Regions:
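Leucine-rich repeat
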Residues: 1-262
Length: 262
């Protein structure tokens, strides 16, 4: 059907059922011989499960796409090779600024060329996953970021945020234990990030994750980082990342002359 709509500029696809019927999924995963090019498509939105999304993106090309908005239902594992290829080969989705926000019922990964669009408005790229538990959100976000590494490796400024009452960690979330390795897995794909901004509600979580184990000894972890900007509300918290910063300074200043500021 899409072949008959070469002038299509906006396309929205949505499913209300979280899980696909097995037979329907097999049919969707059967790719066309040649992808359909939608030469003037500028806005694409999708709501459903990852298998449907990935299958659909394998079958289209949208060289002039300006905005991609995705909402996925929660699932145990995210394997999105065609989404990764689609974002990496679409010129309008090569973006320098990203923000990962954790909310009460979902988390989102958004990216744009302007900071104000990432924080408010309509970003060029947004991917939202519906799930409630904080530890599950972090795990899913790590999987999503890993799947989108080709795209996220070009991000230069990254913000980690929490959207809630007073922007503070809820009581039920405080009981969720997130392994430090999972946080590092989430940050790992951002190899081009020069700035990392962290909201005050996540400072303790991130400081523990970045200072545990031998993460600071790995030059492949956040290799381009120059500015670490945690948001502090506690006067005694300004040394939360001191150990991590000191390790990076020792390893990197001597080798590449980069500067790192807190």
């Amino acid at each position: 059907m899409l072949r008959s709509l070469p002038q299509l500029e906006e396309l929205s696809i949505g499913f209300s059922i979280p899980l696909p019927r097995p037979s329907a999924e097999r049919e969707l995963l059967h790719e066309l011989e040649a992808p359909v090019t939608l030469p003037v498509l500028k806005h694409l939105t999708f709501r459903g499960v990852g298998a449907y999304l990935d299958s659909f993106l394998a079958q289209i090309r949208a060289p002039l796409l300006e905005q991609l908005g995705i909402t996925l239902f929660n699932q145990i594992a995210f394997e999105l090779p065609h989404l990764s290829h689609f974002t990496n080969t679409t010129e309008g989705l090569r973006l320098p600024i990203a923000k990962i926000t954790f909310e009460r019922d979902a988390f989102s990964v958004v990216a744009d060329g302007r900071a104000q669009q990432v924080g408010d408005g309509h970003p060029s790229f947004s991917l939202r996953v519906i799930c409630k538990q904080f530890d599950w959100q972090i795990d899913c976000a790590a999987q999503i970021c890993g799947a989108l590494m080709a795209m996220l490796s070009g991000i230069e400024q990254l913000t980690l945020d929490l959207d809630g009452p007073g922007q503070s960690m809820s009581a039920e979330w405080q009981d969720d234990v997130v392994d430090g390795a999972t946080w590092r897995e989430l940050l790992g794909p951002f190899v081009g990030a020069r700035e990392l901004h962290i909201c005050h509600a996540l400072v303790w979580e991130l400081s523990c994750a970045l200072q545990s184990g031998d993460v600071g000894l790995d030059l492949g972890f956040l290799p381009s980082l120059e500015v670490l900007a945690p948001e502090f509300k506690d006067d005694h918290a300004d040394n939360a990342f001191a150990s991590f910063i000191l390790t990076l300074v020792k390893l990197r200043v001597a080798q590449c002359g980069c500067r790192l500021h807190q």
